[in-house]
Amino acid sequence: TYGIVHPREQWATQRDMRRSPFYAREEAAGAKFFDARGWERPQWFTSNEKLISKFKDACEARPHEWDARWWSPITNAEHLQMRESVGMVDLTAFNEFDFTGPGAMKFLQYMCVNNVDVEVGRSVYTPLLTPGGGFRGDLTIMRLSAEHFRVITGAFDGGRDNYWFKRHMPNDGSVTFTDMSSALCTIGVWGPNAEKTMAKIVTGDHKAFDVSQKNFPYGAVREVLIGGVPCTMFRISYVGENGWEVYTKMEHGLRLWDSIAKAGEEFGIIPVGMGVYAVTGRIEKGYRLMGAELESEYNPVEAGLNRPKVKSADFIGKAAYMKAREEKPCAIMCTLEMIDNKSKAGIKRYPTGGNEPILTKSGDRIVDAKGRVSRVTTAGAAPSLGKYLMLAYLTPEHAVEGNELRVMYMNELFPVRVARVGSQPLFDPTDARMKS
């Protein structure tokens, strides 16, 4: 006999290998820790269980044990509280790589699809490509000075990206690579009251610092003091809310956490788990994830991440990328919504995002011109929308808004509808909540 591994299954051994400086506060708040490449990372907090009664209509329990395994309705409550006020997320498992030296900008231009030659204090989102034009990485870059760039990549992507960058490093001494991942900790602060929270404690040159969008726009990076702690604030969001990623040295982390928590008390600030950051908040915005939507067999055009113009500088995968831009895509990333999730037995089911097949209305497989089968890459609740969503690549003929399809889950077909084609999200499609 053999066991079937749940897509969200957690390791039972070799735990507690890496802890953020916030661990004691998180443990006291009843964090349910998941493993993230050795890091203990909160998925949800039992201290937020009281919010279920506040948002009860959006926090239904899942009746089937398999669907409910490694999940909690607390996640939906945390999601809605953050959308209503403000939440703080432990992002210490991020990987941070510093590139410095006179050749740093030229090197990163060659590695990255998008233009990294931005002003100091600005940032850029960019994929990394394979020579064949598929996804090799997905990251953001902050320009901290003329010859200092900081690359931010995901918890599970650091080893791969570290290798890829080092493999292509020039050997003339013009670029220095420093892995800062074990030196820095990170807190995400997001929500309508994030600005009010941070305005109380952020200073620059020992005086109040204006954190408004006018002075501190989306994508900007600033060096500040927060509760006396030197920090790098980066205005960006992966959950579709106004706010920042805040970076500081590990030894300052606990004071930073306590300063933000105290400042946000009057707004009902809560700790928020990765169930919101990595699933519900992300899927409402249709954001792609490396290793899920972004894989080497798909390209930026298919993922809806191609930009209107391509930089003149050469980069890895450029020829293949230019060719893909000229051709009709074989597949398009889409957002699907479940129409009816009741099984034949009358039980509400919730696909886990474990590569469930997407089929035609008549139950036939959807296969693109390259032989790739349509499947669910991410699935999760969208509490702000009252929907259950999935992301999947579809062929152009099926990638039509309103088109009805089927998802196979536990050998049963459930009706789904194409809600969005491409990168436009269902939630806040103009990004007003993040950028105004």
PLM segments and residue spans:
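Glycine/proline-enriched, intrinsically flexible loops and inter-domain linkers
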Residues: 1-436
